[in-house]
Amino acid sequence: MRTNCWWRLSGYVMRHRRDLLLGFGAALAGTVIAVLVPLVTKRVIDDAIAADHRPLAPWAVVLVAAAGATYLLMYVRRYYGGRIAHLVQHDLRMDAFQALLRWDGRQQDRWSSGQLIVRTTNDLQLVQALLFDVPNVLRHVLTLLLGVAVMTWLSVPLALLAVLLVPVIGLIAHRSRRLLAAATHCAQEHKAAVTGVVDAAVCGIRVVKAFGQEERETVKLVTASRALYAAQLRVARLNAHFGPLLQTLPALGQMAVFALGGWMAAQGSITVGTFVAFWACLTLLARPACDLAGMLTIAQQARAGAVRVLELIDSRPTLVDGTKPLSPEARLSLEFQRVSFGYVADRPVLREISLSVRAGETLAVVGAPGSGKSTLASLATRCYDVTQGAVRIGGQDVRELTLDSLRSAIGLVPEDAVLFSGTIGANIAYGRPDATPEQIATAARAAHIEEFVNTLPDGYQTAVGARGLTLSGGQRQRIALARALLHQPRLLIMDDPTSAVDAVIECGIQEVLREAIADRTAVIFTRRRSMLTLADRVAVLDSGRLLDVGTPDEVWERCPRYRELLSPAPDLADDLVVAERSPVCRPVAGLGTKAAQHTNVHNPGPHDHPPGPDPLRRLLREFRGPLALSLLLVAVQTCAGLLPPLLIRHGIDVGIRRHVLSALWWAALAGTATVVIRWVVQWGSAMVAGYTGEQVLFRLRSVVFAHAQRLGLDAFEDDGDAQIVTAVTADVEAIVAFLRTGLVVAVISVVTLVGILVALLAIRARLVLLIFTTMPVLALATWQFRRASNWTYRRARHRLGTVTATLREYAAGLRIAQAFRAEYRGLQSYFAHSDDYRRLGVRGQRLLALYYPFVALLCSLATTLVLLDGAREVRAGVISVGALVTYLLYIELLYTPIGELAQMFDDYQRAAVAAGRIRSLLSTRTPSSPAARPVGTLRGEVVFDAVHYSYRTREVPALAGINLRIPAGQTVVFVGSTGSGKSTLIKLVARFYDPTHGTVRVDGCDLREFDVDGYRNRLGIVTQEQYVFAGTVRDAIAYGRPDATDAQVERAAREVGAHPMITALDNGYLHQVTAGGRNLSAGQLQLLALARARLVDPDILLLDEATVALDPATEAVVQRATLTLAARRTTLIVAHGLAIAEHADRIVVLEHGTVVEDGAHTELLAAGGHYSRLWAAHTRLCSPEITQLQCIDA
């Protein structure tokens, strides 16, 4: 890969031959003109010295024409060169996304989202930085070749002296290439790790906040950032070592040529004009030589980035697409023939599974969490290929079938209802984008989501936000079901499709499903007894083995494990009594103390929020000392660079014209000393700037991330999560890049301008007026450029965040996109966003291409004016030839910093946009305040006082006038239809959100007055969205209490019934879990979440659908543990399954965001209202007479 990455990149560049030819052609022509201009200068000076009054007007016309041609050629070179960079970056990004869309399950398990983000952003930017200079490489090489040719024509001895340093420069460049490549690659790997920490914390933000672990996540980031800091410092040291050295060697060569050329001119071997022309050529070549040396550094960084991007592009799925299409008409059978499979070699998850589903039959597969049900579904949809055996659909091995024909026949309802950004209608029609509104409405009606949609102001055009997290779990699940039904599949695979809906809605859905699957093959992976009414046969899985297959009655009779899994929860009344005496329950005064003691991880310094109205500015002030030292060294370096023209003037006027060779030698020696001093100062400046820049980056990233962690959940909705990831990664780097390089360039430019203007005024004030004639034009052009480019950069920055958000979304929902053959539409969406970003980049490049060459044009015009008028004054004896030469050299130096300032403005714009975004983020109010009340032990009284709440993305309020008082120690179950506001109530108690109106009080105190972290440390929360961080199973359980012992972790797992599932995993509690728990089933994740909440021993327990992914047997264990845990502590439970509601102290029924019923179980049943209907449906669904279950009329 490393050996051919340049060839691969050149292949991408060659896709745009027209742009390449135009850019190279303009570079070639511009180089020829630039090399020939010094010959014109030679002629003008020689004519001036000869004082023969030859007309200079023709040469003026030539110089002006050359300036105009150079402007046009520079515009073409810059525009098309930049356009190539943006086009290639877009091509690489699209190829990387296409590779992502091809991934099978194993590739998806291999790549983390952090790696994806870094490789498609930071690494691509490194490649783009090099591609911007592709035409410049040819220009510089041509300049060197033509320059050497011209210098050889002017003077062979001087030319030989000039090229002596080339081998030395080549050796140093080769050594720097080897060292920098390894260092940069290492730094990029650490950068990916940092991005991975940020992305995981953003994805799992609900879990982070639930357990008050914001500071812990910040510590993770600080730890990863320290490793990145060390790696980046090594790169900075190497750059400081090689960069100044490679730039100093050409300057030493110039001093050598000055000494020898001056001696030859004094001896009459060459004319003064020849010497000046040679010096002009050498000066012209010094810049390309330095630039090429700098490009070597950029090239090594770009190479490291290119290798990583190409690795992503070259990633291939392990499975091979078949060649046979699946018959489009026949009904399908599904058969597993002695199937064994493991995610890791020698660790089978499924063992010798032989199972068949006849065409038109419905098979239900039941099993405990971790038994292999979801893995079996993944094999049917061919996310993975079996290790042994075969999976056959319609009698054909799925490995022989084309993926497109296979997946077109399958409809999938996954256990995790993944939605995509867009509207509700677009998500329902995800598998059939050509569906009519009537077809979408029919599918929605079948999934019982239509009523909810009709309450929304925008109906089916309502945006669901990123991953649909603004909707309730039941609403997302019903949209996923409607999506599968609209697809009209011949084989329907459903993984607990109604686990998050209430009993009444489930009955209605079952009636629709019974009709929908009547003429098609269906496989239902379920933990719910009610879904078995749809099945013709049942298969029982346990620990990856098939225990039994048959009709529900047959299996019930002969399979003890089946009866155990589906046995309804026993009467839990006795458990309530036992719970009162249980030794695991502590007195109220002791509850929650360990959670508070063991989760307050403190890492002082790097993430303390700087106070004040402008926290970003205050933060940067902390580095005033190092930054001032860096800028002082830069100023010294710049002043040293202004001395050579004065020394040259002295050498020409005294050493050459007056034949005082000692003056020439002293000038050359002083110039050499100046170059050496400048090299030392430049090295020191680079070291200080490198260290300071990395320190600022470390600090800024930590502060921004820590502040983002403290924001409310609403900041992470829509594409807010992607924008936060961009702020912590790309935006902070843009600011520091400007401080490290742009600010240095600004200081150099300003010092240079001031110094040159002083020198020019001292030499000949009158000629300065000629230069000033161009300044108003330059100022007007700069203002116009700044105004036009500012809008472009802001839009481009926002669009980059959208590109990143789309990438993250499809990385998370890739299996759904593949299952519904939506890869091409995903590619189109990503292409549209990436192409918008590309077009904005090209627009910005056009502005740059218009502006920078215009600065060079003004410089050429000013040089022409000074040269002509100065030559006239030389003839008149007003100024010396040396003064004129010095003037011309200073003019070149004068407009160079102006151009660099303009170029620096490009970096400034990027940094300014990034700073604005970060300033806005840091200025966003956090739920906690400095005057927040510290939280001690909580009794647990919860009061909702006229509480209203509306989500930002919805006009319909989620809660409307909630008035409830929950005494301390009471267990309350919230029930109601999906979307009625139950989860929102839990989130308000957890203070994920603050009420729009009204107050939530705990122990008589408004939650907004509490220290939010201290308060959450008193809670135990299980959210609907299960998330675990990468690490071991033990780490996942101990997330809310990191210092818990192994015995305490195991005890928590046993108490919630998770221990058998964990011990069945490879390595048990040390089993490695991927970020988000992608290698675990929903049931396994839910058990870990329950154990996690149990371990913190909370004062208030909040459970939001904590058992929806569990089988009845495991649910019974969990419910007993919940009742034990709930004794003598306030417990709020959101439940669709009503088994636990019967034994709660109180039941609250919500509908449309209001409380419609409130009372005990027996009271509400006697009332005959909403709860009575829910209970009747629940009772029917959970009846032991499985074969006789009938859903009531919803």
Swiss-Prot record:
Enzyme's top EC category: translocase
PROSITE patterns named in the record: ABC_TM1F, ABC_TRANSPORTER_1, ABC_TRANSPORTER_2
Membrane protein topology class: Multi-pass membrane protein
EC annotation from Swiss-Prot or TrEMBL: 7.6.2.-
Binding site for ATP: 367-374, 976-983
Record-linked InterPro entries: AAA+_ATPase, ABC1_TM_dom, ABC1_TM_sf, ABC_transporter-like_ATP-bd, ABC_transporter-like_CS, P-loop_NTPase, Type_1_exporter
Primary location: membrane
UniProt note on regulation of activity: Efflux is inhibited by reserpine.
Keyword Nucleotide-binding: yes
MF annotations from Gene Ontology: ABC-type transporter activity; ATP binding; ATP hydrolysis activity; ATPase-coupled lipid transmembrane transporter activity; efflux transmembrane transporter activity
Domain named ABC transporter: residues: 334-568, 942-1177
Pfam families per UniProt: ABC_membrane, ABC_tran
GO biological process: response to antibiotic; transmembrane transport; xenobiotic detoxification by transmembrane export across the plasma membrane
Entry note about domains: The ATP-binding domains (NBD) and the transmembrane domains (TMD) are fused.
PANTHER family attached to this UniProt entry: ATP-BINDING CASSETTE SUB-FAMILY B MEMBER 10, MITOCHONDRIAL, ATP-DEPENDENT PERMEASE MDL1, MITOCHONDRIAL
Family: Belongs to the ABC transporter superfamily. Lipid exporter (TC 3.A.1.106) family.
Name used for this protein in its record: Multidrug efflux ATP-binding/permease protein Rv0194
Lineage, top ranks: Bacteria, Bacillati, Actinomycetota, Actinomycetes, Mycobacteriales
